[in-house]
């Protein structure tokens, strides 16, 4: 409405309903989404700053969520990319060596190279590093988490295995199929087998290097083997209890502000919610009242 009044003042009587419709269409298609995105970014940075003040750390957030960049609600799918690793490495370089780093992760995974770069940079930082997982950090996200001095997860959050994927297939499954079928396979399959062997060996060694200082040689080798050898499917949820069973130390005290930050990454506007609830915390008295 404000836009229509503004345009009417500018254009005067010469403005037709078609002109108004055109300007409104341009506004909704390009200008409004950009304005909302800038507003959300400002709120995110403010929330990050509050977490930094509370914890005395440099906070870096890598949150991959579907976001709609137009009023049509077209979702943009996100995962760990080289651009992410460039930005995180830059943020770490801008952080004093004696300042702790909190890396907040919410991701399905992504490129192995980018994840490895982030993991190495995190491990090499001299002050304490913490990875905070409010919901999930699968695949490459799990690899990054293993590099931190401390992992903080929501009690219902999950990580995942870091076994290599060759194209659309797990490297461990390619090897399993080869061992069952024997030598009577195509040249292409033999090439995939060779790549799979190398990929598993490389990832196992990489995870071991991340863990050995924290857990010691024997335990680090055991955890690395378990996470990279295809023990589970790639999307298998490693819960807090499962991680502790593997010997990985996990803290479940996620700062409340981290959840508030995650809420500033809304799902696409065009998507109809399938979950409904009253979005306020209930007190114990309210619980007792409802029970009656």
UniProtKB/Swiss-Prot annotation:
The keyword Cell wall biogenesis/degradation does not apply. One of its GO terms (cellular component) is membrane. It is a single-pass membrane protein. The chain crosses the membrane at residues 17-37. Its main location: membrane. InterPro entries: ClpP/crotonase-like_dom_sf, Pept_S49_ser-pept_pro. Keywords: Membrane, Transmembrane, Transmembrane helix. Signal peptide: none annotated. It is found in: Membrane. To M.jannaschii MJ0137. This is Uncharacterized protein MJ1495. It comes from Methanocaldococcus jannaschii (strain ATCC 43067 / DSM 2661 / JAL-1 / JCM 10045 / NBRC 100440) (Methanococcus jannaschii).
């Amino acid at each position: 409405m404000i836009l229509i009044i503004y345009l009417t003042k500018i254009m005067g009587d010469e403005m037709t309903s078609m002109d108004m419709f055109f300007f409104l269409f341009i506004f909704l298609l390009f200008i409004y989404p950009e304005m909302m995105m800038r507003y959300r970014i400002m709120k995110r940075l403010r929330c990050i700053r509050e977490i930094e003040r509370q914890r005395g750390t440099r906070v870096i957030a890598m949150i991959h969520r579907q976001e709609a960049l137009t009023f049509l609600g077209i979702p943009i799918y996100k995962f760990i990319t080289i651009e992410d690793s460039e930005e995180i490495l830059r943020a770490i370089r801008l952080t004093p060596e004696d300042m702790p780093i909190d890396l907040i992760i919410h991701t399905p995974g992504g490129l192995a190279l980018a994840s490895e770069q982030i993991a190495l940079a995190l491990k090499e930082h001299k002050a304490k590093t913490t990875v905070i997982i409010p919901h999930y950090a699968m695949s490459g996200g799990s690899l990054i988490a293993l590099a931190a001095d401390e992992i903080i997860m929501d009690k219902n959050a999950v990580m995942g295995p870091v076994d290599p994927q060759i194209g659309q297939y797990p490297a461990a499954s390619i090897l399993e199929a080869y061992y069952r079928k024997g030598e009577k396979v195509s040249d292409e399959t033999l090439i995939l087998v060779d790549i799979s062997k190398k990929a598993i060996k490389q990832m196992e060694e990489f995870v071991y290097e991340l863990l050995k200082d924290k857990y010691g040689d024997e335990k680090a080798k055991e955890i690395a083997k378990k996470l990279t050898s295809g023990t589970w499917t790639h999307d298998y949820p490693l819960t807090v209890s499962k991680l502790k069973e593997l010997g990985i130390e996990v803290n479940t005290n996620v700062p409340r502000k981290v959840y508030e930050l995650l809420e500033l990454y809304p799902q696409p506007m065009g998507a109809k919610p399938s979950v409904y609830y009253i979005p306020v915390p209930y007190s114990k008295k309210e619980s007792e009242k409802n029970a009656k």
